[in-house]
Regions:
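Cap/lid segment of the alpha/beta-hydrolase catalytic domain
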Residues: 1-29, 76-79
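Active-site loop->helix "elbow" adjoining a glycine-rich segment at hydrolase catalytic centers
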Residues: 12, 44-47
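Alpha/beta-hydrolase fold nucleophile elbow
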Residues: 32-44
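Loop/turn elements at helix/coil->beta-strand transitions in domains of secreted/extracellular proteins
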Residues: 34-37, 58-62, 112-116, 150-151
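Alpha/beta-hydrolase-fold catalytic nucleophile elbow
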Residues: 41, 66-67, 119, 158
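Hydrolase active-site cap/lid region
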Residues: 49-90
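The feature captures the conserved acid-bearing segment of alpha/beta-hydrolase catalytic domains
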Residues: 74-130
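C-terminal catalytic histidine-bearing segment of alpha/beta-hydrolase fold enzymes
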Residues: 137-166
Length: 166
């Protein structure tokens, strides 16, 4: 799907976002579901989705990005970093024009003012702690200093690998 979408200036998320909107609309129609409490939690590739879907599906009350948050542009273009996608065979990772428009801090800004959280294992191979902290600092500054809602934004660091903490 990704390869077919790219020539049309689309990504896999052009397909995923409408699916999520439909799912959230359906869940909201069920009497046993509190539509104000539907949240998004994503691990690994799901973490990518946690950054890209909630900005466009406003029905999600919060978003948690686990084992994925980083400096996306650096991750895609660096030829020096061992963390770079340049050295992997993951062809579906590169997304049309994303580096020219959004990094993770900007995607998190589109989630605001809804609560946003990052789960980060110190031994996760996504990126070094310093890179994650640098990108998250921009998000924290937005939530705390600019919007005055610092209680809605956090990062949880834990000793562990590319996994859910808890």
């Amino acid at each position: 799907l990704q390869r077919k979408a790219n020539p049309l200036k689309r990504t896999l998320f052009s397909i995923i976002v409408p699916q999520h909107q439909q799912i959230v609309d359906w869940l909201s129609s069920l009497p046993q579901v509190d539509s104000r409490r539907i949240a998004f939690y994503g691990l690994s590739y799901g973490g990518k989705m946690a950054m890209r879907v909630p900005p466009l599906v406003k029905n999600y009350c919060l978003s948690i990005c686990s084992a994925d948050f980083n400096d996306w542009i650096w991750k895609n273009v660096s030829t020096r970093s061992p963390y770079s996608y340049v050295w992997t065979g993951e062809y579906e990772i590169f997304e049309f024009d994303l580096g020219n428009t959004f990094n993770y801090a900007e995607m998190a800004a589109l989630i605001a003012p809804r609560p946003f959280m990052v789960e980060r294992g110190h031994f996760d191979g996504v990126a070094p702690d310093e890179t994650v902290a640098y990108e998250f600092a921009k998000v924290r500054h937005l939530y705390q200093a600019r919007l005055g809602i610092g209680d809605r934004c956090r990062i949880e660091w834990f000793v562990g690998p590319h996994t859910i903490h808890g």
